[in-house]
Amino acid sequence: METLFEVAETTAKAPAKTDQLYSNLEEYKKIINTNPKTKWVKANPYANNALYLPIGIVEELLNKVFPFWQVEQHGEPKIIGNSVVISVTLKVWHPILNQWLSYAGVGAVPIEVQQGAHPTDFTKINAKALHKNVPAAMSFAVNNAAKKIGKLFGSHLNRKDSEI
């Protein structure tokens, strides 16, 4: 049986069956309320070194903890100010509760314009900006939704006081 701390050690292998990770609600709560491994956590130099989990880690954790999960995008990407904004619902199948659980998430990424251009001068958008900014906003939205599941998914990474 894989322990909580070995959950992502097998990311190169096939996903573990969730019944190997938890068999009751208390075990599930223990898993999702454990801090992520330090080696998974990265600092974002563009956001005052805010800590985050890369989307690849989040997706592997979703694969390990839940038998099924899916992302539903709400409408089309929106442009607000100079950013691409995407809203999603992350749905995970909880095998103990025998139901889908839903978590809302929003992601935004500034649209890249040519150096020196005003951020909202859309005549100066870099050629491939939206090609990479839209998927990045989607990744941030999924990551934001997953944080709501628990500490394992990064919910407490940037909190000063997280103990009750």
Could you tell me what each predicted segment is?
Residues 58-164:
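Positively charged, aromatic-enriched nucleic acid-contacting surfaces
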Residues 1-55:
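N-terminal, Lys/Arg- and Ser/Thr-rich interaction peptides
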